[in-house]
A protein has these predicted regions:
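Active-site mouth of glycoside hydrolases
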Residues: 30-272, 276-284, 298-300, 311-313, ...
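Recognizes extended acidic, P/S/T-rich segments that occur
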Residues: 427-468
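Bacterial N-terminal signal peptides that target proteins for export
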Residues: 1-15
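An aromatic-rich alpha-helical recognition segment common to small helix-rich domains
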Residues: 403, 415-417, 428-429, 462, ...
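Substrate-binding cleft of secreted/luminal carbohydrate-active enzymes
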Residues: 301-389
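Beta-strand-rich modules
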Residues: 464-482
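Pro/Thr/Ser/Gly-rich low-complexity, intrinsically disordered linker/stalk tracts
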Residues: 388-423, 468, 483-496
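N-terminal signal peptide c-region/cleavage motif recognized by signal peptidases
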Residues: 21-23
Length: 496
């Protein structure tokens, strides 16, 4: 029997399992660094993916804009359910993702109550005290880490945002009547609060695994923050040193944006240098990969933390540069295209529309996403994943697992089901007896609408000749190019 190398077996396991559910395995080791390479055990660790920023907090675009938010971008948010988080992580892993960078910890703003929002970081209980972690929020963060361990996904976790969208440095500084720029001043109250947040997070005990975050192998790296473009040498030096002092198990990413800091290249506590590519910054091109690798010159690991918001051919050119470009033997460890959204608990997908007109991508890709080149983007990412593992092309996707059918009040109004990871289409069946026979009432049903609005739309309605007072039974089967799932759970309803 020929044994696959360790790294390849991790990548191929979902495809080789086919109809079998993913195992609940624990990682054997932390991800480590050897010069410009990441290692999983003794094997080089490289990854490509579609960036999934919201594994721990969701912008609910279907609800529209909260006008009470004075920032002019008042978004509604919600916490993910356990079903949602498991579904998303399985979709990522089964499609070939080995690692994922999520978005930051959110910071409280004055308009949160009016917009029905909760955040991860709350104001101090007393003036000039330290911020507090919101336990109601952090249990979802705990579960994200636990599920990533269970299904085999390594996490990159940034702390605070340069920007205000989820609440960032400006909102943290407001707790202390300081300015947003004081965040980068290592003598400020805001920076002291930032340091305390880092301490609280790293030392937190996961309520699901029972382990401190600093002992969680699912965590690959801590990132100082998201797009911290005003980072100074004292800021990076003190922050990286604090993280390493608290946590000797995990790697540290300099979260600076748009430049390679020479001082970070010489800092023994910084392991990974990251950059983000966007057209608005004039760097959304494959040549930027070579420029960054030359600037880093093999002193650190190189990560393309985000790129996107352009056509699929352009994305592919950058992704192929990430896979193949070398400078004195150093290559990008990973690259993420912005951005992914997953299934909703009761059906359809979450979505987000960018200012460029691009939509978030839904895995495994759907005909409804053709204007967004969705399937093409998913496929180019899967090809890059395979190439990083030493293959020319990706293996077929595994067949989907069963979807989850939700309770039905009136099948003539709506039948809701949570789509299966990797399901492309669905068959809906009805019977008048639990044991059948089953009649197909909907075939080739898609849940892949780009802008699914659950408050106004239904995934499916039973338009057959139904008899009031009759008991009906329903089930759903997921299908993709590799096969079909077992039937879902059965939902029964007496027609009103």
């Amino acid at each position: 029997m020929t044994l696959l190398p360790h790294a390849l077996s991790r990548l191929l396991l979902p495809a080789l399992l086919g109809f079998i559910a993913l195992p609940g395995y624990a990682f054997d080791e932390f991800i480590t660094r050897d010069g410009h390479r990441l290692l999983e055990g003794s094997q080089e660790f490289r990854f490509a993916g579609i960036h999934a920023p919201e594994l721990h907090r969701i912008e609910d675009d279907a609800r529209g804009t909260c006008t009470a938010d004075p920032r002019g971008w008042g978004q509604y948010f919600r916490w993910p359910t356990a079903d949602e988080q498991a579904n998303w992580i399985k979709a990522l892993v089964k499609s070939g993702h080995r690692a994922m960078r999520v978005y930051v910890l959110s910071v409280a703003t004055p308009s949160d109550a009016e917009c029905g929002r909760e955040t991860h970081i709350l104001p101090p209980a007393e003036p000039d005290a330290m911020p507090r972690l919101n336990e109601a929020a952090m249990v979802h963060y705990d579960r994200m880490i636990a599920l990533s361990e269970q299904y085999g996904l390594r996490l990159i976790l940034p702390f605070i945002d340069h920007w205000k969208w989820w609440g960032g440095r400006e909102q943290l500084a407001a707790f202390y009547n300081e300015s947003a720029d004081d965040f980068y001043d290592t003598n400020s109250k805001t920076y002291a609060a930032y340091q305390d947040i880092i301490r609280q997070v790293i030392n937190r005990t996961n309520t699901i695994t029972g382990r401190a975050y600093k002992d969680e192998k699912a965590i690959m790296a801590w990132e100082t923050g998201n797009e911290l473009k005003a980072s100074t040498e004292p800021f990076v030096r003190k922050t990286a040193a604090l993280i390493k002092q608290l946590d000797s198990n995990h790697l540290v990413i300099d979260g600076t944006y748009l430049k390679i800091n020479k001082f970070a290249l010489d800092d023994p506590n910084v392991d990974i240098i990251s950059n983000h590519f966007y057209t608005t910054n004039d760097n959304n091109n494959p040549e930027q990969v070579q420029q960054d690798l030359q600037a880093i010159d093999g002193k650190k690991v190189y990560l393309i933390g985000e790129f996107g918001l352009r056509d699929a051919d352009g994305l592919n050119a950058i992704m192929q540069a990430a896979v193949h470009t070398e400078h004195n033997g150093a290559r990008a460890a990973g690259a993420f295209i912005w951005g992914f959204r997953g299934h909703r608990h009761n059906g359809g997908f979450y979505w987000h529309k960018e200012y460029t007109g691009h939509y978030s991508y839904h895995i495994p890709g759907f005909p409804e996403g053709e204007p967004n080149e969705e399937r093409k983007v998913v496929d180019l990412v899967r090809k890059a994943q395979a190439q990083m593992a030493g293959f020319d092309s990706a293996l077929p996707l595994p067949a989907p697992e069963p979807p989850v059918l939700r309770a039905i009040a009136d099948p003539r109004v709506r039948i809701d089901f949570m789509g299966a990871p990797l399901g492309r289409r669905y068959r809906i069946e009805r019977a008048t007896n639990m044991a059948g026979p089953w009649k197909v009432i909907g075939d080739n049903i898609s849940d892949g609408l780009q802008e699914y609005r659950p408050y106004e739309q239904a995934l499916f309605r039973d338009t057959g000749a139904l008899v009031p007072g009759q008991m009906y039974y329903y089930r759903v089967i997921a299908i993709n190019e590799s096969g079909e799932s077992d039937p879902s759970n059965i939902a029964q309803v007496v027609l009103p």
